[in-house]
Every structure is written in C-alpha cells, then in structure tokens.
Curated annotation (Swiss-Prot):
GO terms of biological process kind: protein transport
Keyword annotations of the record: Protein transport, Translocation, Transport
Native source species: Staphylococcus aureus (strain NCTC 8325 / PS 47)
Upper lineage: Bacteria, Bacillati, Bacillota, Bacilli, Bacillales
Name the UniProt record assigns to this protein: Accessory Sec system protein Asp1
Subunit structure: Part of the accessory SecA2/SecY2 protein translocation apparatus required to export cell wall protein SraP.
Length: 517
C-alpha cells in the first residue's frame, strides 16, 4: 500500500485550515503532484491512502473538486476531535437559532445577518456553496469566527482581541467541547482537562509537537513494513515524518510549483537513504548539488507527476488561428522583446490571434496591459474603417486580437488548449503541466529550453532566442504537413506518459530499494 502525505499548508501556520471564501483568489494553484499521483492510482484501481496532518475541515469537498472523493484518508485532527467519516452535509443557516427580528441581507460575496442595531454575523461560502465561516461583529468589531467542517460539524472557534487581531482558537469535539486551546500569539497549545488522558503532555510549545505525537500513534497502527510513504517535500514536516518512518519506506516528492528551489534547510530535513522524486531539471540539479555537498547518495528519479490523456483540439475547425503564449517565469525585458516580435508577426494576417496565458493575473505588468489595449484598439479601428466589413459587424462581432486567459486551475489549461494551434513558452523552466497538456491536445510547442517532453522538429521547436520565433511559427503555421507530424508524434507520447507508465516508474524506484535489501 502506498500512503501520500501532502503539504496543503497555510503560509504562516502550516497546520491551520487553508479554506477561504470562494471570491478570494488563491496565490497559488491547488493542483499538485500529490493530487495527480493519487488520481493515477485511483484511475488504475490501485490501493493508496491519504494522510492529512493539518486542520482541514473542508477536505472532502476539496477532494471532490479533483475527482478524488473516493480516496481513503486518515486525518490527525479527526483523531483529535473525534470526527467520523461521512459525506459532506451543508449547513442550512435558516435552521439555526436567530432572533425573531433577524434580517438577512444577500450580497454577491456573503450573507449578512443583522441581529440588532450593533451586532451582525457574516456568513462566508466555499466555491461549492458550503458555509465555511460565521463571523460575529459587535459595533463593527470582529469578535469570533466559527469555522465549520463540510460534514456539518462546528470544528473550531477563533477569538479576536480589541484590535481585531486573532487571539486564540478552540478546537472542538463532535459534542461541541473544547479539546484544544491554541494561543495564536505565542503558539502554545493547552489540552482541556477532560481530554488530557489521551495525550502525553497537558501543554505543548506549538501545534507541530502535538501533531507529531498523534502522527506517531496513527502510523504505528496503520503503516506496515511493506508499505511505502510518498511525502510532498516541505521543510516544515519532513523531519517529523522521518522520525517515525524508516528511510527505505520513504520517498520525498519535489514539485516545482511548491519547491522553486531546494534550500539547505529543506535538504537537511530529508532523511538519509530516502528516495527522491523530482519533476524538473532545475530541482534535480539542486538536489545533486546538495548530495555532493553533504556526501549523500539518495536514489533519485525525474518523472512528470502529470499524466497525458488525449484531449480534443478544434483549432483546425476555426477561422482564426489562435497562438498561445505562456508569459509566467520571464523577465520584464525578455517578455517585452517577445511581445514586440509577436505583435509584429500577427499583424501579417487578420486571422491571427494571441492568447496570453498566466497563473498570476494581478502580476501582469502595466506596460503589457497598455500594449494589449493599444493593439486591440488599433485592430478594431482598422476593422471599422473597412466599409465592407463594418457594415456586416454587430458589437458582439468585435473581437480582440490579443486576449489574456488566467489559469486559476489546471482544467483552465486544458480548456485553453482546445482552440490553440500551437503554444509558446520561452521561460527558463517551461511549465510542466502546460507541456503535458499540449502533448495531450496534440499541438506543437515552441520552447526556449530543452526538456524531456519536447523533441525539436518532432512535437515542437527548441529555439535559443526570440529572434528565431518567426521561423518556428512559420514552420507550423505555413506547413500543414509539419503540424500533422507534430500531432502524430504527440499521440505516441501520450502512451509514453500515460498514468500506468508513471506508476511503473515509481514502483521500480520503490521496489529497487526493496530488492536491494
């Protein structure tokens, strides 16, 4: 049996709940190596289990979001709070005890429940429509936040001081008793007297100590000698996990969107002789450098944590030719140079369109926004000046020659690629999920760096500078034979990077160690 331990953590206190109201954009995408690898095991009917260390009251709806609802899991905080496994259950706020004269004020973002002239409660919802927080205000001052579990439990209450800062948090049992009191100022955790016999201490310096104690007890009952644990590498939990699981049973997964680089602290938190799984050339280089520095020889494998799965592409059915451009991971100077090239290129034909892809809409520089507006206005003015064209056009027909597509989740990538004729990624480390998705869609890729997933002149072009962009674009846009060859080559790669093959590579890494012992 394989066990997966993710790092779906808060940036400040890693054990705290990460759920936010649906309208708050996440700084990073949720989809990661753990979600993908578990999905592959589920798809292939292989046994696996999830172990969650942090407080995750909305775990079930989170798993459902990524088609992992059937995943078996163990939760440290479920053990602490005595919560049992059952299906999500939305809270009907109408059934709660409100004053007779309560007024419900509906807004696009929250529900405001006015209970008196000086008090009101705001109810916040997840993207699935579940109530996640009730926040009580007195004289416009936040007093308490009630944190709800997606199974219908009241999971915790956070209290705020007179300055509106979080003061302490109580974690509740299924019966509504306080089992843990966490001081949010100094981090200390106190176990309520009624439950102290379940713990080795009555007080802990921080929640991480208590979590490690409960984790140790959990794995002593669940994990056996032949089992293997795949851990999302994170310096905040690596050492605690390694303290209780033998190195031969451990693999650490390094994922570029989580581990941009490997620090000394993170590498030293990894137990000697554990396996290492990496998804990028840069992370592999970082780890090799650390291995040489500390004279270690951890077995390592570089694989994609994302599977290929053939997806539709309708670019040949469209009148316009859509060119996708990944703009993340580039310096301002390089991005400006590339955009100038591309703007000049699409001016050659009226049917060329640019779709700029980014995970970080708020980080798009002002000059680029102005460039997009200017090019679009110039194009529309040209269309309006053409009497024959403008006579046939309605306001709905006026389209933009350059558009921005924000990638909130990985399905946004798949959706964007449906209409693209090809995709460009000139960043120093081409986005892995974009490459795998382009293979799945069968479209050519133009990259500025050599990778395992793009073969020059086969399913794409590898160019050294943006000066070569025109030739690379012409190669696929002017010659259908070249595009068709890239499509056929991508179909072959779909088999190579299918989920069963990725799992086989993982098993070879794990079983190789077992054979050696």
């Amino acid at each position: 049996m394989k066990y997966f331990i993710p790092a779906w953590y808060d940036d400040q206190r890693w054990w705290q709940d990460t759920t936010v109201p649906y309208y708050q954009l996440q700084n990073k995408t949720e989809f990661d190596d753990m979600i993908s690898l578990m999905g592959m095991h589920l798809e292939n009917d292989l046994d696996y289990q999830l172990i969650v260390l942090n407080h995750a009251p909305n775990l079930r709806t989170f798993l459902h979001r990524y088609d992992l609802y059937e995943t078996k899991y163990s939760s440290v905080f479920d053990e602490i709070q005595g919560f049992s496994h059952h299906a999500p259950q939305a809270i009907n706020y109408h059934h709660l005890k409100w004053p007779d004269d309560v007024e419900f004020v509906y807004t696009p973002y929250l529900l405001k429940c006015v209970t008196s002239e000086q008090t009101y409660t705001n109810i916040y919802f997840s993207q699935e429509g579940y109530s996640i927080w009730f926040e009580e205000f007195e004289r416009d001052q936040l007093q308490r936040r009630y944190i709800f579990d997606d199974r219908g439990y009241l999971s915790a209450i956070r209290y705020f001081d007179d300055q509106g800062e979080a003061s302490y948090q109580e974690y509740l049992t299924i019966n509504g008793d306080c089992v843990l009191h966490e001081d949010l100022k100094n981090g200390r955790v106190t176990v309520s007297k009624r439950y102290q016999h379940h713990y080795q201490q009555t007080e802990y310096n921080n929640m991480a100590q208590l979590i490690e104690e409960k984790f140790q007890a959990m794995i002593a009952q669940q994990i056996h000698e032949d089992d293997h644990v795949i851990v999302a590498s994170d310096a905040r939990h690596n050492r605690q996990i390694a303290n209780h699981i033998p190195a031969k049973s451990l693999s650490y997964s390094f994922f570029k969107n989580r581990n941009e680089t490997v620090s000394d602290e993170e590498y030293q938190s990894i137990v000697k002789n554990a396996h290492l799984i990496v998804d990028s050339v840069q992370l592999e280089r970082d780890l090799i450098s650390h291995q040489e520095k500390y004279q270690r020889e951890n077995t390592m494998i570089r694989i994609t944590p994302f599977e290929t799965r053939q997806s539709p592409n309708i670019s040949s059915q469209l009148m316009e030719t859509f060119i996708g451009v990944w703009i993340d991971g580039m310096s301002d100077a390089d991005l400006q140079q590339m955009m100038q090239r591309l703007v000049d290129y699409i001016a050659q034909e009226d049917y060329y369109r640019l779709i700029l892809l980014s995970r970080h809409q708020n980080d798009i520089p002002m000059w680029l926004r102005e460039c997009i507006t200017s090019v679009n206005e110039e194009y529309q003015a040209k269309q309006n000046a053409d009497v024959n064209v403008s006579a046939l056009m309605t306001p709905e027909d006026q389209d933009d020659i350059i558009a921005v597509k924000t990638i909130h989740a990985e399905h946004d990538v798949v959706e964007a690629l449906r209409t693209l004729r090809l995709v460009i990624d000139m960043s120093k480390e081409p986005d892995l999920y974009l490459q795998i998705s382009a293979i799945s869609a069968g479209i050519p890729q133009i990259n500025g760096q050599q990778t395992d997933y793009v073969s020059d002149y086969d399913n794409g072009r590898i160019i050294n500078t943006v000066d070569e962009l025109d030739d690379a674009l012409n190669y696929y846009l002017f010659y259908l034979k070249n595009w068709n060859y890239a499509y056929a080559y991508s179909l072959k790669l779909i088999d190579a990077y299918a989920s069963k093959n990725i799992i086989n590579q993982l098993d070879e890494l794990i079983e190789g160690e077992n054979d050696a012992t």
